[in-house]
């Protein structure tokens, strides 16, 4: 730097002294200060609510009767079922999961169109767990000043003890986070018993280990770097936002020029403009990602609004109106500067579109969910050969038919084929009785059978006759059907 | 910061913003946003990982060989290991199939689907090249879906055929040939017999002079194997000529060719190649294709 200062001034066109800046930067330690306020309270409530749901949901019971698990939320891989309270999803109904993902994306878009990255600030697991880990850190190592002082000072027994304690508690939380995860995949009380008696499966222990490691690393060590460098959402969000979205914003028109309380008071007395920002840096100190909101919207800002709380507290103290930093839209900011009436447009094309899409997909899913039947049938026509000529000259088509019984009891279905008068139907491995071909299926199961349909009469050349396979419950009379074709030469 | 102090710093993008690298193209300046250092260390770690990988696993080609790696891993032994794992996994279900009599498998839905699943795969691996993916057959290779059987379509007969083959060289395999009558009968006689044979299945009129002559020749030469009324004989593997199903083709030219030159298709014996359980599964699969008796 000194040598550079001695050199003659370079022209502004070629100002390069790029080597002074490092290519790689070490992480700047962030010590967010604790803060109290409306948004902080909201965050506490959401933290307790979301983590409470996550940790306790596997233990909620839901009676489905015999032959079915009584866990309210269960992803049952061995039998390929997903249980969610009164809903049971089969593998072929995976579109509900796809639908949920689409809904989640659209809700995220809607949240973003209304109030920026509220997801990031309040509900994102990375934010919630980091918040929890920060709370532990403050509780053990003290708030911002104390923690900074301790970190800058020499290693003492007390400091070591505190660090060990902190990391132990972090690991404990991380371990319990991983532990709660595996409980969603098996009967929770049984699994807990197995885990503590070291009877659990390797997969369970490995999953817990991986999730313990990732939780500890991401929430304890990576923190804001996940949001800034790893997460794609800030980039996507930047492409989705518009001037009406509410974002955590510093109202620079009100805040600038900055100055101390005294200077501002003097300036006002003299009739000069004075900003409300007293440059106390509280908004920066409380920020968990270490940004200065007064520099405007930026990638690293997760919009948790803690700076709003911090600033409001200061404004209260110096008797200035709250809201120097607030959820504010670009349009409103500009309107205010131009002296126009405030702009609040939550209802606009994109929010209406997102809401309509959410309602459409949500209602569609609900409609199909309510209209689901407890039995199903699917048929595949043999492709090779498509038909067979038998020795007596009759024609036969073969089908693979899968019957579905979603009820939790044994059921017997009568199988029949319509559309081809005189055709004979037989099921491989099933004796034909007085009721015709009756196929029994166990509770909550499917059964695949090979079905042969034989036709005696003559068919037109190249015939492809639509037929319908129908099953009828021998007890309840419930039916299901599927369409296929009978094909001739 | 004063302007003079700033002059020897890299230019800054706006107030308090990141500095620029000093590179400029058409007025667009490149911001200098340094990457996080852990990113760099992650990059170094991948390089070290690569070196470790070269040492641990087969990696470098040599003149006539390759570096085998200290772990001794190779894809061939990995496959062998996976197959043995799979066999262990299947041991229970294979044992079930092996211990139940062939006739009882189809009565048990669980065993039936097990046998059909295993049989389907074994069929695709071993039988499909001749008999077609779905057992539909081809010229000279019987369609296994119909109810016409040369050597019988009961479970035991199918199992016997699969195990020992046809004209396969296996002592217990099916023998018997369609003789070549080209040197025994005249061309005119062969033509007449062909007309008669076609009339048996209703493919041609039976009251023509040629067919009537053919009937006499048939009685003298063919009835020994195919039976007096042409119904065939499964003991000899001789074809039923009265149905509409043909192995080599039912047009006159093909029948003339068959009578003149004879036929003797070969099916290999699968007993030495496949396990008894697999043959059992294959038997059930073929039997349930639709023609099982």
Curated annotation (Swiss-Prot), chain B:
Which Pfam families does the record associate with it? Cytochrom_C, Cytochrome_CBB3, FixP_N
Tell me which domain of life the UniProt entry assigns to the organism this sequence originates from: Bacteria
- Record's Gene Ontology CC terms? plasma membrane
Transmembrane stretches, start-end: 43-63
Which residues does the UniProt record annotate as the domain Cytochrome c?
114-201, 209-290
Ordered alphabetically, the record's keywords are: Cell inner membrane, Cell membrane, Electron transport, Heme, Hydrogen ion transport, Ion transport, Iron, Membrane, Metal-binding, Oxidoreductase, Repeat, Respiratory chain, Transmembrane, Transmembrane helix, Transport
User: Which positions in this protein are listed as binding heme c 1?
Assistant: 127, 130-131, 267
An example molecular function term from Gene Ontology annotations: oxidoreductase activity
Subunit info here reads: Component of the cbb3-type cytochrome c oxidase at least composed of FixN, FixO, FixQ and FixP.
Q: Which family does it belong to?
A: Belongs to the CcoP / FixP family.
Question: Per its record, how is this protein called by name?
Answer: Cbb3-type cytochrome c oxidase subunit FixP
Task: Provide the gene name from the record.
Answer: fixP
